[in-house]
């Protein structure tokens, strides 16, 4: 057999890029608090909210969470067999929280592989929630519903760093009933404003159909509860349903999205981009 034929039979190991995740939802439902929580798991605690006029994110902010932090977080999940993922990290895009910034939110939606739609589990859907779903559907972006502020459920007992799946099942029966009531309210709102069925991720992930279903992840960004659940669901969805888009082909022409363009003193015109395909080389 020729060397050429042998080469053709060798499996080429696939290398994945980071999934790009848009973070969107109604103002004050917890987008920035979630991103603060993500940044804090690396030991570098920040509070973006304090640096923003009126507490509203006015530009697209990028947060890169590397794989070592993802592994550390997901290892705390109460699974018998610990899941393994190939992604080198996750890139989160924070989108504006004011309705006048709809065009920028739309830009973020078109960049993303997956989105997380944050909803205050007690308040439910608001106008920007509905707008976000419409944008995500128009761009064919799969999304996860995050039921944030689960600690607002009466007598809910939070524990920082705990899986929200574990926490949900450790609450008293009365508290679980109240949490279920809020969940079923969200389920109805999702059905009213989209074509999708909603399921708690621990009940629906094995039978998940991306054409018809969306997963629900409860959490408390304020109390640091349920972050590992969200990271797990993001990676599980991305590597299963968006895998072809994540595979890096180094010889391909570079493709990506310009997030911002500006003039910098002493440097000149600069652009911030997210590279989604191929490789950028000197001289391109």
Feature-to-residue mapping (PLM):
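GTPase G-domain guanine-specificity segment
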Residues: 150-209
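Inter-motif core of Ras-like GTPase G domains
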Residues: 102-123, 137-144
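Conserved nucleotide-binding/hydrolysis micro-motifs of P-loop NTPases
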Residues: 41, 70, 96-99, 121-125, ...
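Conserved G1/Walker A P-loop phosphate-binding module
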Residues: 3-95, 272, 284
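Conserved catalytic-core segments of large NTP-driven translation/proteostasis enzymes
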Residues: 17-38, 61, 68-69, 199-284
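Flexible beta-alpha connector loops of hexameric P-loop NTPases
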Residues: 45-51, 90-91, 117-124, 166-180
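Active-site phosphate-binding and catalytic loops of NTP-dependent enzymes
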Residues: 3-11, 42-54, 67-80, 101-103, ...
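C-terminal effector/interaction modules appended to NTPase cores
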Residues: 2, 73, 86, 110, ...
